[in-house]
Amino acid sequence: PDLLVDDPVRLYLAEIGRVPLLTPDQEVQLGRAVELGAYLAECRRVAGEDPVALLRTVWTRFSAGWPVVAEFAAAVGVEQRSRSVLLDRVVPLSAHPPTALRAALAQLGQSVEALEDALRCRRLEFALFPPTLRAWSDPCDRPLPPEPPLAELDLDPDALAAHWRRIQQEGEAARRKLTE
């Protein structure tokens, strides 16, 4: 039989067959870019547009919240050498044995939701760091000072502003790609 032109289901199926689908990895990458851009916007609402103030806000959130991540990692037996690796290994919570997870939550006095949110925020903040700051702060044995080491790393405000713009643009582009 001929294709009925007014059959909406057939028209829809014919149309979606022309649109390339994303792979699961692409969906995850785009979702992370959207989430990172949204978190940057949230930090920007707190800090304003000054790139150094924005970095200080992100740094303060990260350094203040890091002890919870380190305590949780120790409680579930995750090695603490590199903050980037540690953040990848503690998430998702479902990857940890239920008894170890329950014990860690009791030790920390946290709910699953609060801990998941804390871990998610630390991952986002670490991802927001400029590459030089991320590399500087990656070793777990390096104490996190109350202020980011701006002078030590020679972090230029214009370069920081460009870094924030790139993250924002990538987040917006990812959002468009996911909704097209």
At which residue positions do the language-model features occur?
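Transcription initiation cofactors for RNA polymerase, centered on bacterial
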Residues: 1-180
